[in-house]
Amino acid sequence: MKRTKLKDKEVNPFKTILFGFLGYVIIGVALISLPFAQKIPVGFVDNLFNVVSAMSTTGLTTGSLSDMYTPFGKIILLGLIQLGAIGYMTLTSFLILSTSKKISTHRVKILSAEFSMPENFDLKHFISNIIIYTIIVEFIGTVLLCIEFSKLGLQKPLWSAIFHCVSAFSTAGFSIYADGLCRFQNDVSVNLIIAFLCYAGAIGFIVPMDIYRRLTHKSKEITFTTKIILFITVMITLTGSVIYIGSS
């Protein structure tokens, strides 16, 4: 009993996440600093900034990715963006699973209520569904963007579609083009696809899962959390649209 309590005190999920993040940043900086990852010499601070930005999906860079990095370097950044996005979506799940072997039924009910999950939800199933959701959405987005980019005659439409799909779904804002997505400002199809991916990533997995459970009659009603997320999303979208249209 004492050993169990001692182990619980020694294992700190938050420290694990922090050191894990730092570890990925160090690996990312090391890889992106390799000569064949750069088109031009890029300083340590610039590489560090870009890697942290990718991991945290903020979308800020110290320069044009197309001018700074080779395809290998861009793949590294894309991997970090995806890792950062999935990490945020599974952060809570990771914290739960870190103690899942010793979690009590009482604690499961508390977590179920806190995160608006069904009382009998399975943690491993929950995480696997997040991954499946990510794969499905990004696959659909990639196919649609690839079709549109091919119509526009862009070079390497598949690679461009993959990168911008992951970036949009992660709400990272990264682009392999020097002018970002400005070249598509008059393309309704591309903008709608990007917007869909951004929304799908921003609302997360719980909302569509909750709606699916309601439509399949596995739950009696949509949870309060989902209602709040959808309400705020709609309100922000409408308000932003009105302000934008009014100022244009």
What residue spans do the PLM features occupy?
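Membrane-proximal intracellular helices of multi-pass ion channels
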Residues: M1-S248
